[in-house]
């Protein structure tokens, strides 16, 4: 049984699919820049959901869009003296690199807004015909007050809202709108903007209508699960519901799941606070992709994730232990490839081990089935990794170390189970790096020496210290001009 917290009902519900194939739609990125830690948090969570559904014998169709036309993309294109298409294409390629590095399965379909303009226009026309939309001088708006159920996802009070076409809070009313709460379905093109032809003239779609049209085209009127960050509950997902249910006359999604935001040292991650972390920067700084993935899964997807040096270091050490266990076959140099057919193991012992491991698999499924309790699932992973790591400690220290047949059977079965369950979490073996023996006091001393060198503009010496520490397996992370942290790699 799988239970999920449904933002729509505000409670945990037993998951019941509509039919044989679970239909999932996830709001994708606006492709104007590299992905950040918040994106990693979101897409890792939904990757675990998808993997767990497949592990639980569900067939899944997973769709995630690209928003490839938007004010931010147009602004970036202008800054780079390039085109909207060039900016989008470049960042879609970089998106795939980041997601692949984190072990995130590629969606079954990744529609782009610009490829669905005809569907979007048809969708808007339906809303117009039904009286939910109106046009004003080339712009088209959704009339929020026509929809009595508006606000059911976010519990927003229409009387307290004052939102503009993008759904952002403002103080002044747009004179074209019947009400300030109405939002844009189609935007009239400005002189210097790319545009698409439509029944209302040249322009481009609003953000919210893109997803409604793509959900319908890719998955139908009603889907099982709609995913996104908690920052999308309002206005984006609220507006999606308003559009889709008005046009189709059916419920858009049975389950709405939203992940929590990322904080950096207790503060919300944002560009303005200069604590913004891209996935690329984090990995380049020496944090392995699987350490990052493990770190994200230590906290339930709905809760805020606090990115701190201490939490990251703890995750790095924990993942290192699991990674050693996943490297069991490599480290034992083929000694555990199989058990010879002539070697006899008591059936009672086999049954005992099989039962114990089946109980662990059951607890693992119960944890993930309880609203994706990844921390609980990781506890089972750690339990499986422990005997493998303990054995390796002996095996590598004692030359000619031998192992009894029963223990060999236990370790092999334990390893197979570990491999299977880590795959459900998307954790994959990484190349082991010999650990540095340098002490923390020496690291701190060298960091202070490097900071002093930088203040004196002796950058050659600063680089020399960085390289020295790197040779010893220590990667420095410059948080600011005055603050440098480190991790073992």
From Swiss-Prot:
Intracellular or extracellular location(s): Cytoplasm
Cofactor note: Binds 1 zinc ion per subunit.
UniProt keyword annotation of Transport present: no
Binding site for ATP: 271
Locus of motif 'KMSKS' region: 268-272
EC number: 6.1.1.16
Pfam assignment, any one: DALR_2
List of residues binding Zn(2+): 27, 211, 236, 240
Name this polypeptide is given: Cysteine--tRNA ligase
Organism whose genome encodes this protein: Prochlorococcus marinus (strain AS9601)
Native organism taxonomy: Bacteria, Bacillati, Cyanobacteriota, Cyanophyceae, Synechococcales
């Amino acid at each position: 049984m799988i239970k999920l917290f449904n933002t729509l009902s505000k409670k945990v519900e037993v998951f019941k699919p509509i039919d044989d194939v679970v239909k999932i739609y996830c709001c994708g990125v606006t492709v104007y820049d590299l992905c950040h830690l918040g994106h990693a948090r979101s897409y890792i969570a939904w990757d675990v959901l998808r993997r767990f559904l497949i592990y639980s014998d569900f067939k899944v169709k997973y769709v995630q869009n690209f928003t490839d036309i938007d004010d931010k993309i147009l602004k970036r294109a202008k800054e780079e003296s390039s085109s909207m298409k060039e900016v989008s294409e470049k960042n879609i390629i970089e998106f795939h690199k980041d997601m692949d590095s984190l072990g995130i399965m590629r969606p079954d379909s990744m529609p782009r807004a610009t490829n669905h303009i005809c569907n979007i226009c048809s969708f808007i026309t339906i809303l117009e015909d039904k009286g939910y939309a109106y046009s004003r001088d080339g712009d088209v708006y959704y009339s929020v007050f026509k929809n009595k159920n508006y606000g059911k996802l976010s519990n927003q009070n229409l009387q307290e809202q004052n939102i503009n076409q993008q759904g952002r809070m403002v103080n002044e009313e747009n004179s074209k709108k019947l009400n300030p709460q109405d939002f844009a379905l189609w935007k009239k093109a400005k002189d210097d903007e790319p545009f698409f032809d439509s029944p209302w003239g040249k322009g481009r779609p609003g953000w919210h209508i893109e997803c409604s049209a793509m959900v319908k085209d890719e998955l139908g009127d009603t889907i099982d699960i709609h995913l996104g960050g908690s920052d999308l509950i309002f206005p984006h997902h609220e507006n999606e519901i308003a559009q889709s249910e008005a046009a189709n006359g059916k419920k858009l999604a049975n389950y709405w799941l939203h992940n929590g935001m990322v904080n950096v040292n207790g503060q919300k991650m944002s560009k303005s606070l200069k604590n913004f972390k891209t996935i690329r920067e984090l990995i380049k700084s020496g944090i392995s992709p699987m350490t990052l993935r493990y770190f994200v899964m230590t906290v339930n997807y709905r809760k805020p994730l606090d990115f701190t040096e201490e939490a990251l270091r703890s995750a790095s050490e924990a993942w290192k232990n699991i990674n050693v266990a996943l490297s069991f076959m490599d480290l034992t140099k083929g000694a555990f490839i199989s058990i010879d057919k002539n070697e006899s193991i008591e059936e009672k012992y086999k049954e005992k081990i099989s039962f114990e491991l089946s109980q662990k698999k059951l607890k693992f499924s119960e944890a993930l089935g309880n609203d994706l309790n990844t921390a609980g699932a990781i506890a089972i992973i750690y339990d499986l990794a422990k005997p493998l790591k303990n054995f390796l400690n002996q095996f590598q220290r004692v030359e000619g170390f031998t192992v009894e047949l029963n223990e060999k059977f236990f370790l092999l079965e334990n390893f197979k189970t570990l491999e299977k369950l880590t795959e459900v979490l998307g954790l994959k073996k990484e190349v082991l790096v010999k650990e540095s023996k340098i002490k923390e006091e020496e690291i701190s001393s060298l960091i202070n020496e490097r900071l002093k060198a930088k203040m004196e503009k002796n950058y050659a010496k600063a680089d020399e210290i960085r390289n020295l520490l790197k040779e010893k397996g220590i990667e420095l992370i410059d948080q600011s001009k005055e603050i440098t942290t480190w991790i073992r790699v």
